[in-house]
Regions:
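Short S/T/G/P-rich N-terminal loop/turn motif that feeds into the first structured element of a domain
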Residues: 1-76, 81-93
Length: 93
């Protein structure tokens, strides 16, 4: 018998100028993610374009996470890390 998934997930997909620079910025922003109830981040890269990044994360508090994804803190961190264009951000259960 399958147990229903009760964990919400947050997926962020975007292109970056340079993966190494972006990854350092992503890692440095861990405290901010955790304070928003976002944990267990897994980073995936497109095999054909290593600067095309998808991040899958667990969400403990959807309201806090939604506030965080709309925050100037995240926008600034993404800009500093070299995110290109607007990210695609989705919540899923």
């Amino acid at each position: 018998m399958n147990t229903p998934n009760t964990t919400e997930n947050l997926t962020i997909h975007h292109k970056v100028q340079d993966y190494t620079k972006w990854r350092a910025g992503y890692d440095a922003h861990e405290t901010s993610r955790r304070s928003a109830g976002i944990t267990n981040g897994r980073v995936f890269r497109n095999a054909e374009d290593p600067n095309d990044v998808i991040v899958l994360q667990d969400v403990g508090d959807v309201a806090k996470a939604r506030t965080w994804v709309a925050s100037e803190d995240l926008k600034s961190a993404m800009q500093k890390a070299g995110v290109v264009g607007s990210p695609t951000i989705r919540f899923a259960a």
